Amino acid sequence: MAGISALGVGAKMPLGETLMQLEAAENKRLEPLDKQMKSYDAQITAYGKIRSQLDKLQKASEELKKFDKIVATKVDDEFDAFKVTTDGKASIGNYTVSVTELAHAQTLKSKAVSDIKDPIGETLGEGKTRTLVITQKGEKEPLKIELTDSQTSIIELRDAINKKEGNVSATIVKAQDGVNHLVLTSRKEGTDSQMEITVEGDSKL
């Protein structure tokens, strides 16, 4: 075909030199495209970094909304006698705690009884029971004890209460005048162990 010249044997131009010139020309033509590709790569990398920072900022913003989780202060020391906690509203500083009164276990006693084996409740009849309920604020459930007619003496009450192994212990104390009292004592100290005693089904006990 006209206009087409052959390279190689029979041609007067050096083949190697011609190929190098063609390659150089092609590389020069591709230089702008190569620069543009590098520019695109740099932009994509920059976008990725910006996106990563935005994700971190969004996560931090969501955490800032949860003010109840932000605590600006903390307690440095621990104490055996009491527990100290702080929150975000506490002012930074040193504090002194003075104990003016120690917590103690509550003790209750029954009315005086001459014979510890005498029933002090009503006679309900065979098969019927009454329920002794001891409520303490610090306990999840009140202590409930079902009692038959034969279990209303203070010695039987003592045994029934102790058998439950709750936060209340029962003992019998003999006074100087010879009378006896059923004494109930909370096993734990503090106001949460204060006892409230009621009897369901027996107005006399």
UniProtKB/Swiss-Prot annotation:
It is found in: Secreted; Bacterial flagellum. GO terms for cellular component: bacterial-type flagellum filament cap; bacterial-type flagellum hook; extracellular region. Keywords: Bacterial flagellum, Secreted. InterPro entries: Flagellin_hook_IN_motif (IPR010810), FliD (IPR040026), FliD_N (IPR003481). One of its GO terms (biological process) is bacterial-type flagellum-dependent cell motility. It comes from the Bacteria. The keyword Secreted applies. Signal peptide: none annotated. Pfam families: Flagellin_IN, FliD_N. Homopentamer. Belongs to the FliD family. Required for the morphogenesis and for the elongation of the flagellar filament by facilitating polymerization of the flagellin monomers at the tip of growing filament. Forms a capping structure, which prevents flagellin subunits (transported through the central channel of the flagellum) from leaking out without polymerization at the distal end. PANTHER family: FLAGELLAR CAP/ASSEMBLY PROTEIN FLID, FLAGELLAR HOOK-ASSOCIATED PROTEIN 2. This is Flagellar hook-associated protein 2. It comes from Proteus mirabilis. The lineage of its organism: Bacteria, Pseudomonadati, Pseudomonadota, Gammaproteobacteria, Enterobacterales. The gene is fliD.
